[in-house]
C-alpha cells in the first residue's frame, strides 16, 4: 500500500499484479520521503515509510482510512489480473519464492487448497479505479499524468522484482477442467465485474 500525500493518491496493493515493482518505482522516482507513506515489502526489499510499527504489506481500505483519514479526498486506484493467470502466479510464488507449499505439490493440488489471492475485500469499500494488469502500463501513464507526474514505462519495466519465477507457458496449460471451475467460483465477482474469461490454449 502506498499513500502519496504529496500528489494526493492512494495505491491499494493487491497480490500477484506487480504491486511491489510499482511501489519501488514510485518510491525511487515520485516520492516525498518526509510525508508520503508506504507499507513496503520485506520479501521484495521495498522500504517502509511513515507508518506505525507493524503496518506492512497488503492493507484494506478501512485500515488505510483509519491510519490517514485524508485519503478519502485522494484519487484511489488498485490493480487486478485475470484470476486464472493470477492463481498460477501465486502457485509459483508460494512454491519457489517463499516455500509456503512443498516443492512437489502439483498445481491441481494447490488449486484444491483454495489458498487464492482474492483481494476485492481490500479495495471495494474505497471505490477505486481498477486498472487491469493486462494493460496496466498504458493506464498508469494516464493516471499518473492526471496526478501531476509522468510515468516512465521503460524505467518501470526495469523494476520487475519477481521475474523468472514461473514458466513462460500460457497459464491455461496448467489447468484441468476441474481446476478452471474452482477458480471461477472463487473469483466470481472479479470475473463478472471485470469481464475476465479463461483463454484456453491447451
Language-model regions: role of each:
Residues 1-202:
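Membrane-interface amphipathic segments in extracytoplasmic regions
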Amino acid at each position: 500500500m502506498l499513500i502519496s500525500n504529496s500528489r494526493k493518491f492512494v495505491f491499494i496493493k493487491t497480490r500477484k499484479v506487480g504491486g511491489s515493482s510499482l511501489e519501488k518505482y514510485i518510491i525511487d522516482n515520485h516520492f516525498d520521503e518526509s510525508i508520503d507513506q508506504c507499507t513496503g515489502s520485506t520479501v521484495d526489499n521495498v522500504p517502509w515509510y511513515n507508518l506505525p510499527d507493524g503496518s506492512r504489506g497488503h492493507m484494506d481500505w478501512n485500515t488505510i482510512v483509519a491510519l490517514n483519514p485524508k485519503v478519502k479526498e485522494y484519487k484511489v486506484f488498485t490493480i487486478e489480473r485475470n484470476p486464472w493467470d493470477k492463481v498460477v502466479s501465486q502457485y509459483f510464488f508460494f512454491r519457489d519464492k517463499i516455500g509456503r507449499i512443498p516443492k512437489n505439490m502439483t498445481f491441481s493440488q494447490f488449486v484444491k487448497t483454495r489458498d487464492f489471492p482474492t483481494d476485492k475485500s481490500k479495495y471495494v469499500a474505497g471505490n477505486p479505479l481498477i486498472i487491469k494488469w493486462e494493460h496496466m502500463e498504458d493506464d498508469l501513464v494516464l493516471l499518473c499524468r492526471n496526478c501531476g507526474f509522468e510515468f516512465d514505462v521503460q524505467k518501470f519495466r526495469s523494476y520487475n522484482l519477481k521475474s523468472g519465477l514461473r514458466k513462460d507457458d500460457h497459464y491455461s496449460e496448467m489447468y484441468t477442467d476441474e481446476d478452471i471451475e474452482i477458480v471461477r467460483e472463487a473469483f466470481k465477482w472479479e470475473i463478472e465485474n471485470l469481464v475476465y474469461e479463461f483463454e484456453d490454449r491447451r
